[in-house]
Amino acid sequence: MSLQVSAVPIKTSTQNATSAVKRHSSTYHPTIWGDHFLANLSHSKIIDGSIEQQFEGLKQKVRKMIIDLNNEPCKKLGLIDAVQRLGVGYHFKSEIEDVLQKVYHDYSDDEDDLNTVALRFRLLRQHGIKVSCAIFEKFKDSEGNFKTSLINDALGMLSLYEATHLSIRGEDVLDEALAFTTTNLQSVLPQLNTHLAAQISRALNRPIRKYLPRLEARNYIDIYATEESYNTTLLNFAKLDFNMLQELHQKELNVVTKWWKSLDVATKLPYARDRVVECYFWMVGVYFEPQYSFARIMMTKIIAITSLLDDTYDNYATGEELEILTEAIERWDIKAKDALPEYMKIIYTTLLDIYNEYEENIAKEEKSLLYSVYYAKEVMKRVVRAYLAEVRWRDNCYTPTMEEYMQSALLTTCSPMLAIASFLGLKEIATKEAYEWASEDPKIIRASSIVCRLMDDIVSHEFEQTRKHVASGVECYIKQYGASEEEVIKLFRKEVTNAWKDLNEECLNPTPVPMPMLERVVNLTRAIDVIYKDDDGYTNSHIMKDYVASVLKDPVPV
């Protein structure tokens, strides 16, 4: 991207006449999707009444398969894993929970198959059961190293590798296992058959714990079909489920795209990123299940308007204009728009309209839950206050300390705001007490924010310094501690790893709030890992094109 300085005539409340204001703004590429999702993308030729009837029949067969596992649960962990990775576990939550509880209570320590032990550990931890990592000590030799014989068990090493990503702080054996499996899986990769090599290659780049559920489902459908022991009923059910959900997602995206088109962002706010499709993809990552349809639409609107706010504060508006905008958002009153420049009025009125729409929907369904919108508004106000603080630093050429920077930057990731907004879709599960908890910077939301902030800084700090922009965490750390860029990035990556461990720990029973709330935070963090792992995939959306297409555009062949 290139740096562009544009002189745009605007009128503000402090100017009686229109005058040219020099603005430093980056030139972002336009949406790569055009009007694609405005078209009718129905799967009508694939999904009709007879297919839905077939789907229900397959669903009951899969349910029976899972229930029958109670007879020999420890031998059937692979089926539970497949059901979940194929993305259909949400149909059978109670049945899976029953099987895993039996697996947990019936366990004996005489199992010496690495794949079985590691798979059991991962599945139980994924469900909040705090099993001990000491079970992996028996795979070490007399010198305390993992046995070299394990190198010949590629499937077992892969299973152990995946299990290590459920670790918490202080579990040294899992840290050692991660180093051992990463090194040796990379070493044996060229010698393996195509099927297993593909799984390992994908896992080394995207472990299950950090992968978005929809992407994992689409990826694993192809992998599962090549396994010798695959179940035809389960595979066909997963394919139909994926396509039926994709049809629903396309209809929602069509609604969102029409709404976005009505705002005419590309013309009226040309300095901003036009990324509504990527915003929707992000929210499908947070919750993909059909019951969250309205929540997905509203969350997409929230993240899209937040993106406009981000670009306005970060990339276009003057400090004076932003003081007025921040004050208006603090007031949260439509009358406050009168003090804003014309281009800001679009953003401000849209922001209020989105939350009003959410409020009206909740009032229709359950008035007692209206408190939830209050918390969503309040955290948005915190975000714009933090945006403004960073603008003041930028305009005063001030490099904050890391402590100052992180206090603001963890808010401007928007992770706390998106977490609290995502709880709106959970309705009565998210109680007033749970919102209070979420508003007090709990460990899991802070950890998610750290992952987002540091991963974003690692991939974008060089570009950010090519324009007038607040110092990133990398520059703040270098100035405060005299470290090299390489040292800072290494440290940040370690902090991201530790933050994931904190996320994992907060998801172990007993949990501070219901698990569905924690799952939203985990999924938001997974989205960050996908978007920012190697580059800024939101700004440079070509990077995410294949991901978006696989989930939202291209059906699974049936």
UniProtKB/Swiss-Prot annotation:
Sequence motif: DDXXD motif, positions: 310-314
Catalytic activity: (2E,6E)-farnesyl diphosphate = (1S,8aR)-delta-cadinene + diphosphate; (2E,6E)-farnesyl diphosphate = alpha-copaene + diphosphate
Enzyme class: lyase
Cofactor annotation remark: Binds 3 Mg(2+) ions per subunit.
The entry's keywords: Lyase, Magnesium, Metal-binding
UniProt key word Lyase: yes
EC number(s) from the headed UniProt entry: 4.2.3.133, 4.2.3.13
Binding site for Mg(2+) 2: D310, D314
Task of the protein: Catalyzes the cyclization of farnesyl diphosphate to alpha-copaene and (+)-delta cadinene.
UniProt name for this protein: Alpha-copaene synthase
Organism the protein comes from: Ricinus communis (Castor bean)
